[in-house]
């Protein structure tokens, strides 16, 4: 539900769909801060039966490497995939690829 709401918010969608995003300038960071979405860069060449347009990753001790991604298919269907407890950050990518390959129509 959080990712669905984020996709519907213009600023959140802009940040989550960008491979790199630079924040607005502040006194501490006059050039802004550049954020890189490694999930999008790593999944873009994988066969997911659609296009993963945005994603957010994270890590906490209780649930390990986690990721949420949003995919759009050529037929216009939209899918959200959420995974947790991957043993590595790369494994998050392959978990999402496997889920999209299995369930995307």
Predicted regions, residues:
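Penicillin-recognizing serine hydrolase domain
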Residues: 1-105
């Amino acid at each position: 539900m959080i990712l669905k709401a984020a996709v519907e918010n213009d600023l959140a969608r802009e940040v989550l769909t960008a491979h790199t995003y630079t924040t607005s300038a502040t006194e501490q960071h006059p050039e802004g801060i550049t954020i890189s979405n490694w999930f999008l860069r790593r999944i873009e060449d994988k066969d997911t039966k659609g296009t993963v347009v945005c994603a957010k990753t994270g890590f906490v001790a209780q649930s390990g490497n986690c990721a949420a991604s949003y995919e759009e298919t050529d037929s216009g269907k939209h899918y959200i995939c959420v995974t947790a407890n991957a043993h590595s950050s790369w494994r998050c990518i392959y978990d999402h690829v496997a889920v999209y390959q299995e369930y995307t129509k």
